[in-house]
C-alpha cells in the first residue's frame, strides 16, 4: 500500500478566493462543494473505496465488534409507557429488528403505569406503527416524533428518508392504521395538536435550514393552504416549541444562543396567532413552561446561571399581552456552582432540571393551592408568590450519575418520573407517587453478557495550564487496571454551544472497555457541564480554552500513567470534530488515532458565508469574522483546514461525513483530508488518513440500529488497530 493510491482531488485555484482584513486565501479544494458535479461524486466514491481498502486488516475486528454489540443487546428493548388521554403509549424494539414498533394499551386495563417485561405482552395492546415495515425500500429512514391526539383517534408521526432533517408529517387513524394525511413536508422540529384534534401546528424551515415559520395545518387539507401564524425574520433566531402537559397552552420560543422571546398559542383557538408574552431582551435567555393558571420561566435577567420565576397569564383582550418583568415573582436563583436548565409542569407539581458539580440534577416543587377550573378553563392565578413549596431533591446516590425528569403524560398526574444512567449504569426509569410517597422502577435496560461490577467509574479533576481552572473528567476502566503506563486510552470531547457531554450508557463502548481500554470524557470549557460561565469561557475570543483543556486532559492521562503515551485515541463529532482538528494541529504526536465524525473543520469559510445554513446564528457562538478583525484573526489561527502543519507526522485519522448533512457540509472533511495528505509526512501503513461518506444519511450518520453498529464498528476497529488491539 502506498500513499499514491489514495484519491487525489486536483487543486483548482480561483474557485473561492478570500480577501478580508488584510488576509488573502485562495482555497484550492472548495470546488468539492459542487455536489452536482460528477467529478465530485466520483471522488467521494473513490475515497470510500480507499477507506475500505485501508481498513481491510481491521475488518475481522469490525465484524467481531458488531457481534459483540449484538450480544450486549437484550431480546427486547422497550420504553416506559406514557399516558395520553385514555391510553398508555410505548415502544419496543426486538433483537432482530433495526427499528422500533409503537404500541398502545387502554388505561381501563391498567389504571396504574404498566411495567413492561422482555417476554410478556400487555392485555389488549395494539400495534400502531411498525417502523421496520415503513423503512422497507428506503436507504435511510428515521422517525422523529409520534404524537397521539388526546381523544386517541389519530396519531401523527414524522419521518425523514434523506437524512437532511426535513421532516414529513403523516397522520393515521389509530384504530385502522389508515393514512389520512401526509401533505406536510419540509417541516422542522415541533408538533402540537389543536384541542379538537382536527388540526395541528408545526415549524417550517427555510433554505438555510432555519425554523423560521409557525404554521397551522388542517388534517386532510392541502399544505399549500396552511396558515402562517408566526414568522421570525431575524436570521440569528430559531422558532421552537413542544406540546405541553398543560392542555390549555403551548409556548412558542424564538431563541438565539444568548437571548430569546416567547409567545402563547391557544389549542382551543388554533387558527389565532400566538400572543407575545415575553419580549426579547439582549443577553437574556428565557424558557417558559405553562402551568395552567400561570406560567413558569427560567431566565437569565438576574443571574447568567438562571433564575426561576412565576409569570401571570396575560389578561384576555388586553391590547398588550407582554408580561412586564417587574411582575415576575422570583422563586429561586441558581446558587454558586448551579445552572438552571429546564421545567416540566403538571397540575400539582413541577420539576426543575439543573446542573451541579458537572452533572444533571433535578428537584420537584409541590403546589400549595389547587388549580381552579371554570367552564373548562383555568382561572388565572392572582398571586403566585406562595403557590409553590420549597424544592425537594430527586438526585440519586452515586458519584457519577446523569439524572433527568421525564414526562409521565397527563397534566393531572401526581407521578414524578425520572430517568438516570451513567457510563456503567444502563438507563433506568423510576416513578415517585406524590400521593403515597412510594416509588417504583418502571424500566431497567437489560444488558446481557455485561457485569458493571468488573469496572469502575470515577470523577477526576485536572488542573488546566492556567494553573487554577479545574477540568472535570469522567474516567472509566477495568476494576483490576492499574496506572502502570501500559493501557490504551480513548478520550472524548465536544466543548461548544453550552452542550453538556454527560456520562451516559452506550453498549458500543463496552467491547473496548472489556479489552482494557481506559475511557475518559473531558468536560471542557465551551460545553455546559459547569454552567453558563463555563460555556462563556470557551467561546468567541477565548475559544482556544476548549482546545487547551482537551490537551491538558489528554496529557494528564499519559502523565498519570493511565494511558501509554503512544496508545491514546481521540474522538469528537461535529463541533467536537473541529476540536479534533485543532488539537491534532497543536500536538499531533499526542494521539495515535483520531476519529472525527461530521467534523466542522472548515469553520472560517462557513462562518464567513451568511448564505450557508445556520451561519448567521453561529456568529453568537464563534463571533462575526466579517465585522471583527480580532475574531477573524483568532478563527484564522485555529480553523483546522487552514492550519495543518507542513512536514509533520499526524496520527491516523478517520473522518466520517454524510452527503445530505445540513449542519456540517460533507465538503469540509473532504477538503481537510486532502490538505492533510498533501502537507503531512504520513507513513500510510502506519498512520493512514481516510474518510468515509454515507451517501444517504445525515448529521447523525446511518439509520437503523444495525446500520449504526456497522458504521461505528468500522471506526472503532480502525482506531483500535492503531493502538495494537487487533482482535
Enumerate the predicted regions with their spans:
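Mature N-terminal segment immediately following signal peptide/propeptide cleavage
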Residues: 7-49, 66
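Non-catalytic accessory segments flanking enzyme active sites
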Residues: 38-147, 158, 237-291, 330, ...
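Short loop/turn segments that connect beta-strands within beta-propeller blades
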Residues: 108, 173-177, 218-222, 266-270, ...
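Asp-box/WD-like beta-propeller blade repeats and closely related beta-sheet repeat scaffolds
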Residues: 121-145, 156-159, 163-204, 208, ...
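Cap/lid segment of the alpha/beta-hydrolase catalytic domain
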Residues: 129-149, 158-164, 178-180, 434-438, ...
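Beta-propeller blade termini and top-face loops
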Residues: 166, 204-207, 211-217, 226-227, ...
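Long hydrophobic segments that form regular secondary structure
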Residues: 232-319, 324-325, 333-335, 341, ...
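Active-site-proximal cap/loop segments of hydrolase catalytic domains
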Residues: 521-727
Amino acid at each position: 500500500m502506498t500513499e499514491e493510491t489514495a484519491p487525489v482531488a486536483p487543486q483548482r485555484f480561483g474557485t473561492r478566493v478570500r480577501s478580508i482584513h488584510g488576509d488573502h486565501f485562495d482555497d484550492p479544494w472548495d470546488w468539492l462543494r459542487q455536489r452536482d458535479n460528477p467529478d465530485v461524486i466520483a471522488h467521494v466514491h473513490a475515497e470510500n473505496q480507499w477507506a475500505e481498502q485501508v481498513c481491510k486488516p481491521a475488518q475481522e475486528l469490525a465484524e467481531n465488534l458488531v457481534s459483540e454489540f449484538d450480544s450486549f443487546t437484550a431480546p427486547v428493548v422497550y420504553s416506559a409507557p406514557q399516558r395520553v388521554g385514555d391510553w398508555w403509549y410505548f415502544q419496543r424494539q426486538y433483537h432482530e429488528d433495526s427499528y422500533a414498533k409503537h404500541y398502545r394499551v387502554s388505561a381501563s386495563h391498567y389504571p396504574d403505569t404498566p411495567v413492561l417485561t422482555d417476554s410478556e405482552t400487555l392485555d389488549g395492546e395494539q400495534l400502531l406503527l411498525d417502523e421496520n415495515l415503513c423503512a422497507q425500500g428506503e436507504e435511510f429512514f428515521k422517525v422523529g416524533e409520534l404524537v397521539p391526539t388526546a381523544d386517541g383517534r389519530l396519531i401523527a408521526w414524522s419521518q425523514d428518508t434523506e437524512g437532511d432533517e426535513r421532516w414529513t408529517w403523516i397522520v393515521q387513524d389509530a384504530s385502522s392504521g389508515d393514512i389520512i394525511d401526509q401533505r406536510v413536508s419540509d417541516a422542522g422540529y415541533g408538533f402540537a395538536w389543536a384541542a379538537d384534534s382536527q388540526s395541528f401546528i408545526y415549524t417550517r424551515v427555510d433554505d438555510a435550514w432555519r425554523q423560521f415559520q409557525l404554521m397551522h395545518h388542517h388534517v386532510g387539507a392541502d399544505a399549500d393552504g396552511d396558515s402562517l401564524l408566526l414568522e421570525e425574520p431575524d436570521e440569528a433566531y430559531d422558532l421552537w416549541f413542544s406540546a405541553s402537559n398543560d392542555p390549555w397552552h403551548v409556548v412558542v420560543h424564538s431563541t438565539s444562543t444568548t437571548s430569546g422571546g416567547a409567545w402563547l398559542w391557544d389549542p382551543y383557538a388554533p387558527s389565532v396567532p400566538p400572543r407575545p408574552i415575553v419580549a426579547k431582551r439582549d443577553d437574556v435567555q428565557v424558557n417558559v413552561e405553562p402551568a395552567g393558571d400561570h406560567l413558569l420561566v427560567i431566565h437569565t435577567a438576574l443571574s447568567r446561571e438562571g433564575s426561576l420565576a412565576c409569570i401571570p397569564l396575560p389578561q384576555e383582550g388586553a391590547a398588550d399581552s407582554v408580561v412586564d418583568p417587574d411582575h415576575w415573582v422570583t422563586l429561586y436563583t441558581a446558587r454558586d456552582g448551579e445552572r438552571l436548565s429546564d421545567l416540566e409542569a403538571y397540575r400539582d407539581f413541577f420539576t426543575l432540571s439543573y446542573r451541579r458539580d458537572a452533572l444533571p440534577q433535578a428537584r420537584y416543587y409541590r403546589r400549595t393551592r389547587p388549580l381552579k377550573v371554570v367552564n373548562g378553563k383555568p382561572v388565572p392565578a392572582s398571586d403566585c408568590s406562595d403557590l409553590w413549596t420549597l424544592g425537594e431533591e430527586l438526585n440519586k446516590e452515586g458519584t457519577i450519575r446523569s439524572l433527568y425528569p421525564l414526562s409521565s403524560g397527563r397534566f393531572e398526574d401526581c407521578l414524578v418520573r425520572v430517568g438516570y444512567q451513567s457510563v456503567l449504569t444502563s438507563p433506568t426509569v423510576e416513578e415517585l407517587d406524590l400521593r403515597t410517597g412510594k416509588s417504583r422502577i418502571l424500566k431497567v435496560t437489560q444488558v446481557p453478557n455485561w457485569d458493571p461490577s468488573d469496572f469502575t467509574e470515577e470523577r477526576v479533576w485536572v488542573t488546566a495550564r492556567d494553573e487554577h481552572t479545574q477540568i472535570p473528567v469522567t474516567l472509566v476502566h477495568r476494576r483490576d487496571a492499574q496506572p502502570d503506563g501500559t493501557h490504551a486510552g480513548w478520550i472524548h470531547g465536544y466543548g461548544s454551544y453550552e452542550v453538556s457531554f454527560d456520562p451516559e450508557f452506550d453498549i458500543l463502548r463496552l467491547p473496548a472497555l472489556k479489552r482494557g481500554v481506559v475511557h475518559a470524557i473531558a468536560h471542557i470549557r465551551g460545553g455546559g457541564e459547569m454552567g453558563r460561565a463555563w460555556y462563556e469561557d470557551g467561546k468567541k475570543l477565548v475559544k482556544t480554552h476548549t482546545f487547551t483543556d482537551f490537551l491538558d486532559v489528554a496529557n494528564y492521562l499519559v502523565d498519570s500513567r493511565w494511558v501509554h503515551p503512544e496508545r491514546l485515541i481521540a474522538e469528537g463529532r461535529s463541533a467536537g470534530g473541529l476540536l479534533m482538528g485543532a488539537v491534532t494541529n497543536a500536538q499531533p504526536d499526542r494521539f495515535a488515532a483520531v476519529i472525527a465524525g461530521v467534523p466542522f473543520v472548515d469553520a472560517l469559510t462557513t462562518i464567513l458565508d451568511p448564505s450557508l445554513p445556520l451561519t448567521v446564528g453561529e456568529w453568537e457562538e464563534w463571533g462575526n469574522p466579517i465585522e471583527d478583525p480580532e475574531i477573524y484573526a483568532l478563527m484564522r489561527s485555529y480553523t483546522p483546514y487552514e492550519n495543518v502543519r507542513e512536514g509533520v507526522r499526524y496520527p491516523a485519522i478517520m473522518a466520517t461525513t454524510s452527503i445530505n448533512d445540513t449542519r456540517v457540509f460533507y465538503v469540509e472533511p473532504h477538503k481537510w483530508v486532502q490538505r492533510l495528505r498533501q502537507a503531512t509526512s504520513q507513513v500510510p501503513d502506519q498512520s493512514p488518513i481516510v474518510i468515509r461518506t454515507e451517501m444517504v444519511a445525515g448529521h447523525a450518520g446511518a439509520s437503523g440500529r444495525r446500520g449504526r453498529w456497522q458504521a461505528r464498528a468500522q471506526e472503532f476497529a480502525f482506531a483500535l488497530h492503531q493502538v495494537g488491539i487487533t482482535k
